[in-house]
Amino acid sequence: MTANTAYTASSHEATTNSFSRRALIGGTAALGAVGLLSACGNGSASSEKTKAAGAGAKIEDLYNINAQDVNSLKKGGTLRLPAGSIGPNFNFYTQSGNTSDNVNVMSTISQAGMWNLDFDGTYKLNTNFGVSFEHSKKDDKIQVAVKLNPKAVFNDGTPITYKALQSTWNIFKSLDNGYNIVTSGIYEFVESVEKGDDDYSAIVTFSKPYYPLQSLFSEILHPALEDVELFNNGFVDAPHPEYWAGPFTLADKGWDSTAKTFSVVPNDKWWDTKPLLDKIVFTQMESSAARAAFKNDEIDAIGASTSSTYAEVKNIAGTELRKGTRLYAGGLDINPRRVKDAALRKAIFVGTNREALAKIQFQGLPYEETIPGSMIHMPFSPYYQDSYPTPNNSVSEAQKILEAAGYTKNGDYYEKDGVKAGCAVVVFGDDPTTKGKAQTFTQQMKDVGIEIRIDQHADSEFATILGNWDYDISFSGYSVSTPDATAGTKQFYYSENNEGIGSKEIDALIDAMTLIEDDKERNLACNEIEKKHMAEFAFLGTITNGPDFVMVKKNLANYGPRLYKSMDWTAVGWMNS
């Protein structure tokens, strides 16, 4: 078998992400989830406005982690970080666990996968787990030869062999196997995963092509997770460190479900570069509590992407602002499982004044952006196109949609078959910015003739409510975890991922898109799918990308906005001066 393309180990990369799915993020920036940060500037906070990166932006201008040689940093110390919601389901491969906070917290202890991303989103072998990745064609089918690092083991001592690759495939290959997965991604196109020359090699044969191939085994799961009950429910309030592998592991009694703290320490079973830090402690906090904690020197970093947080923390001595654009898209998430009438969803899309909501979001921040129009591409991507339906921001056009669908006005609101046109917007946390958006949105919809109720919840309930689809409308969105939109397009717009909501026509377009080998052609096809889906089904809409402003202790190194680059927790540490 002659390989057409080979990726071979040449240098050690410390961490990996899962690139086959995109994680839920709240409507405001995560409190300390640097896994989702991008573009950055230096120095303390200033009033100079930052403009969102657009077409032609230079990648080197879009990140700053205060990069320092690890040999120049202190050995030891503790890093204290806030999180809006930790758990309750620590299996972040499930729908109920797939939140940015969970992904960020668990990334310290769970890094098994073949790939890392560089700043610009290019793939690099994660040599802690993968030695080589070669693909070729045999009998007109794509085959991938994988070689694993024989040093790699899960924390319970289970070696990471071809059996782990088989288990990963078995779990993700179908949405119909009982696993509560987010998306099947590349795995449903795999025909077989077989043992290669030894236990640390495997031959993967595809039933039909899928691109990019580098999304294969971006995650490697412990064979024990093939137990459906364990996969779906076994990680609720139980991180199970024995099933993961990474440079850190859960400390003794490291998950305190009462205090809502998640503490990790260096993993003595880790075979590669040892971490600098002695401990990382994540604490679940509401926004107001996090602001107070940062001012009182109880945490070392805080997201400052809302005006209230930014105003409170921007001038604290010994800190600096690292700022940029989030790898995030969204802000108008209408749950089609609850808001079932497509006409009502379309009217909400068309009647929403996105500019007014974005103005509230960014008021008081030194940041400005053009309203984005894509869930799958960032505006600085060469593939970016505005997919949001037109016309929009129009009360009259929204009313026409309702009336064409059989709604009639009765007082302030439309109704149909005796049922008022309305639903609830769920709001998390106590940040005034989010509450202001909800109140403005409610008035916008009243102008259209749709009644919106505000459903208030704590930040800590975010994962449970959204993971269980227990909401009508949310200001949340998703991470834009890679520059390639293939997996995101399938996750968002394939009907099987949305309980059948969609169309056979769009599903066929997605199936055809995954067969396109040329990256540009495939990603442009993703745009056409997104435009069609938004226009017809209207349940994932864009209001902002937004900044990722993070206030940090000045002497914190190798931590901050890093664009697409995989997080290297081993290199995070404290400078000597």
Locate the predicted segments by residue:
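N-terminal lobe/hinge region of extracytoplasmic solute-binding protein
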Residues: 79-137, 170, 243
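Surface-exposed binding/hinge segments that line
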Residues: 74, 181-230
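Aromatic- and charge-enriched surface segment that lines or borders ligand/interaction sites
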Residues: 132-178, 203, 340
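N-terminal export leaders
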Residues: 20-25
